[in-house]
């Protein structure tokens, strides 16, 4: 059986989140949690929360052994961007793009 959790509109660049997501793909949940705990990135903490939520969702399904769960998929999609303007000298303005992400974690029994 599969269980998934989704976090949307997370104020985090998808490119930076994918670097951390690649480390836990295909690993057992316990090992993935340890990897995320000791990864010094903002995205590691957020992906860890989503993974924890996916495991909690798997507990709600009857007949699922939590110890045998593995990370089947970690999908990081871009969300909408927040566009801002930074004023510069001589009347100019530079555009700042603050990116967001939609994070999906799927866990399954092996």
From Swiss-Prot:
Keywords tagged on the record: Ribonucleoprotein, Ribosomal protein, RNA-binding, rRNA-binding
Gene Ontology cellular-component terms listed: cytosolic large ribosomal subunit
UniProt cross-references to SUPFAM superfamilies, sorted A to Z: Ribosomal protein L22 (SSF54843)
GO molecular function terms attached to this record: rRNA binding; structural constituent of ribosome
GO BP terms in the entry: translation
Keyword Ribonucleoprotein: yes
Signal sequence segment: none
NCBIfam families according to UniProt: rplV_bact
Summary of the function given for this chain in its UniProt record: This protein binds specifically to 23S rRNA; its binding is stimulated by other ribosomal proteins, e.g. L4, L17, and L20. It is important during the early stages of 50S assembly. It makes multiple contacts with different domains of the 23S rRNA in the assembled 50S subunit and ribosome. The globular domain of the protein is located near the polypeptide exit tunnel on the outside of the subunit, while an extended beta-hairpin is found that lines the wall of the exit tunnel in the center of the 70S ribosome.
Record text on subunit structure and interactions: Part of the 50S ribosomal subunit.
Family, similarity comment: Belongs to the universal ribosomal protein uL22 family.
Name recorded for this polypeptide: Large ribosomal subunit protein uL22
């Amino acid at each position: 059986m599969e269980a998934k959790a989704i976090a949307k509109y997370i104020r985090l660049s998808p490119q930076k989140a994918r670097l951390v997501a690649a480390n836990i793909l295909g690993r057992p949940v316990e090992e993935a949690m340890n990897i995320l705990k000791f990864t010094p990135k903002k995205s590691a903490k957020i992906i860890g929360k989503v993974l924890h939520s996916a495991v909690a969702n798997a507990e709600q399904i009857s007949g699922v052994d939590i110890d045998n769960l593995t990370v089947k998929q970690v999908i990081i999609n871009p969300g909408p961007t927040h566009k801002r303007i930074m004023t510069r000298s001589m009347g100019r303005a530079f555009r700042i793009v603050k990116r967001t992400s939609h994070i999906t974690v799927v866990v399954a029994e092996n």
